[in-house]
Amino acid sequence: MMENYKHTTVLLDEAVNGLNIRPDGIYIDGTFGRGGHSRLILSQLGEEGRLLAIDRDPQAIAVAKTIDDPRFSIIHGPFSALGEYVAERDLIGKIDGILLDLGVSSPQLDDAERGFSFMRDGPLDMRMDPTCGQSAAEWLQTAEEADIAWVLKTYGEERFAKRIARAIVERNREQPMTRTKELAEVVAAATPVKDKFKHPATRTFQAVRIWVNSELEEIEQALKSSLNVLAPGGRLSIISFHSLEDRIVKRFMRENSRGPQVPAGLPMTEEQLKKLGGRQLRALGKLMPGEEEVAENPRARSSVLRIAERTNV
């Protein structure tokens, strides 16, 4: 199934253009997926350029290993550890660009066996790396009702979080859920008001997936590490697919695009101001997919690309 899958990369040209590729530069694709961004980056690099790709999905790693290019290397692991990968290669402060395409990928969603989709029945798994960590089924079977409700409210912005959490716990007491269809049916039955444009399990599946994969913590750690690994003038090019992701990226870029916040009238010398440091990033704006891309790939509709540049400070 994996070999026959045709994956359309969202905001492909825009995200790579945002990196402002130098032929001899060193770049990181933190979310290799099926390699759309990586292949385009490689096509713009010269012989001296290098691309380090990262993914925690074993299926993505299998695809990456088919790329026979001395300029390219792949790491099986979370992109939150990019600081460690860069340090191991003695490349701190030498990275010219980092690209992140956040969230679950289309191949993951469309493969029922991965357990990400309420539209296809499969094992209730949802792990981006099925070789480690708790599956969605395991977590839902052991979590307290209050914890499930908190996850649904916080990561799914689900208004009926308490009702749904109660229904999940009650169902698991009777017979533990192991299939995506079972969870989708429990959520639908527990939802008193249906949205005619959205499946009632949409928010629950998003929330459980984010929790199981620690997705928001992964993003925050990767962003924090990026400041240390980027060279002056190095770019961040980040695609988000929902408001929780985009909020983190937007806040990070905004906060690091400011200079030191000093109260008005506070007496400080030039030397003291220098020690506080200046802004570390320059936000270069955001892009959203055009009508043509959305028509061709409806999943692109909610995507937002934000670009920033490391300053010389």
Curated annotation (Swiss-Prot):
Signal peptide region: none
Taxonomic classification: Bacteria, Pseudomonadati, Pseudomonadota, Gammaproteobacteria, Enterobacterales
Catalysed reactions, semicolon-separated: cytidine(1402) in 16S rRNA + S-adenosyl-L-methionine = N(4)-methylcytidine(1402) in 16S rRNA + S-adenosyl-L-homocysteine + H(+)
InterPro entries linked: RsmH, SAM-dep_MeTrfase_MraW_recog, SAM-dependent_MTases_sf
GO CC field: cytoplasm
Family from the record: Belongs to the methyltransferase superfamily. RsmH family.
Organism: Shigella dysenteriae serotype 1 (strain Sd197)
Residues involved in S-adenosyl-L-methionine binding: 35-37, 55, 79, 101, 108
Documented EC number(s): 2.1.1.199
This protein's name: Ribosomal RNA small subunit methyltransferase H
Gene3D superfamilies assigned to the protein according to its UniProt record, in alphabetical order: Putative methyltransferase TM0872, insert domain, Vaccinia Virus protein VP39
Keywords carried by this UniProt record: Cytoplasm, Methyltransferase, rRNA processing, S-adenosyl-L-methionine, Transferase
One GO MF term: rRNA (cytosine-N4-)-methyltransferase activity
UniProt main location, coarse: cytoplasm
Cell compartment(s), UniProt: Cytoplasm
